[in-house]
Design a protein with these regions (language model features):
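Polytopic transmembrane helical bundles with strong interfacial aromatic enrichment
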Residues: 1-204
Length: 204
């Protein structure tokens, strides 16, 4: 629908189609990081391994969507600003920091000391999730004339009904995919934990 039904935007042209994947992926990564926050707090409070595995699953999937947001944002930025990255753009910079936090989270959970990664990863996941509101409000305190980041949805930029239909469909599809991937990654984590438990019992 994004490629076949929605017309080109008058100013940006075909590159505006990136917007549908960019915003939907941002919503997906924010939702996944919200799950990381809840699951990490749950693990630190209860030491329940299921909560830890859910945190890992949501963090890894959220990082994938976070990467998509960063890449599509840079594609749009190159068309709008004639440069891939602008350090003067606070939302882009804060989102890069968010991406780096969850890159660290993913590396830690996959290559760190298994005896320590659960606690350290949970703390890092909470820190990353709490950075999401900072990303969102990072441009709100700037005067309107100084805002480089587009606010298409918030400022009513989707006037054609086909834009709204495509936007709603893209958000639903990407959020559904995100939820499915988190569930599948969680199941893989559970099966891996059970396999390690059985292997440990056999060695005894």
């Amino acid at each position: 629908m994004v490629f076949m039904v929605v017309p080109n935007e008058q100013i940006m042209g075909a590159v505006q189609r990136v917007f549908y994947f960019h915003v939907a992926s941002a919503m997906a990564c924010y939702a996944a990081f919200g799950v990381v926050l809840i699951a990490s707090i749950g693990f630190l409070a209860t030491r329940n391994t299921k909560a830890d595995e859910l945190s890992v699953a949501a963090g890894e999937v959220g990082f994938v969507f976070c990467t998509i947001v960063l890449v599509t944002g840079m594609i749009w930025g190159h068309s709008a600003w004639n440069t891939w990255f602008r350090w003067q753009e606070p939302r882009l910079v804060t989102f890069l920091v968010l991406w780096l936090i969850f890159l660290s989270f993913t590396v830690l959970r996959n290559f760190g000391d298994p005896r320590k990664t659960a606690v350290h990863g949970s703390v890092l996941g909470i820190l990353g999730a709490l950075s999401v509101p900072i990303v969102y409000v990072s441009i709100k305190f700037l005067p309107q004339s100084a805002r480089l980041h587009p606010e298409v949805v918030e400022r009513g930029g989707l006037r054609d009904p086909s834009y709204w239909q495509a936007f709603g469909l893209s958000v639903f599809a990407v959020l559904s995919l995100c939820g499915l991937l988190v569930w599948l990654r969680y199941r893989i984590g559970r099966l891996d934990a059970l396999a390690r438990q059985v292997s440990f019992q056999e060695k005894e």
